[in-house]
């Protein structure tokens, strides 16, 4: 990863200048360590943005293959450019489409949800069928910049209040989903890790 430091710095700089949300450093560290520790070989990412997290996942393990979905054309094209710059086209496949319109036959060790927060339950339900037995679903932004922990009265924007409500609903959905064992981490912007239970665990 050291030889790609300049390219990674450039991607992070672009994200900052163009207000593209990317994972916090400790969130990325958690994700890449998780991939190494759990010997993840295949990842489906919902929400490519400019390709930062997909690139970091690919660089963490030379054997991991990533499929990533992005619906915003500008971000999708920027991600393509970044992936090409790092010669990772053979390991990262991008799909330009709304994730809810994507149907994939493939199975993955990990599904990583980092897209529209209001749709997290839909993403989980749609793509959990693409998960290998004992696979994982990781979701970013569970704290959403600290707003999830605030009293709703403190949040002035109506749209933001609705979004926070959706994230809270998603958390309850994960806690009550008996097919998965979910743990929540106060790392980065809040991360949840849901492990698909073995039939014997249920």
What residues fall within each predicted segment?
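A short alpha-helical cap/connector motif
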Residues: 1-110, 117-138, 142-202
């Amino acid at each position: 990863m050291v030889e790609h430091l300049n390219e990674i710095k450039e991607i992070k700089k672009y994200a900052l200048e163009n207000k593209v949300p990317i994972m916090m450093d400790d969130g990325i560290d958690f994700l890449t360590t998780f991939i190494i520790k759990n010997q993840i070989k295949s990842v489906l990412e919902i929400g490519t943005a400019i390709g930062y997290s997909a690139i970091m996942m690919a660089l963490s393990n030379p054997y991991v293959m990533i499929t990533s979905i992005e619906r915003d054309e500008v971000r999708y094209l920027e991600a393509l450019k970044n992936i090409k710059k790092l010669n990772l086209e053979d390991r990262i496949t991008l799909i330009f489409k709304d994730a809810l319109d994507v149907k994939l036959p493939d199975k993955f060790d990990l599904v990583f949800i980092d897209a529209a927060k209001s749709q997290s339950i839909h993403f989980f339900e749609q793509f959990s069928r693409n998960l290998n037995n004992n696979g994982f679903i990781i979701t970013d932004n569970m704290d959403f910049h600290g707003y999830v922990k605030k009293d709703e009265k403190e949040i002035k924007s109506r749209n933001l209040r609705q979004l926070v409500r959706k994230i809270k609903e998603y958390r309850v959905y994960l806690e009550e989903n008996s097919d998965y064992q979910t743990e929540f981490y106060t790392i980065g912007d809040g991360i949840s890790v849901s492990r698909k239970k073995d039939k014997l665990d249920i």
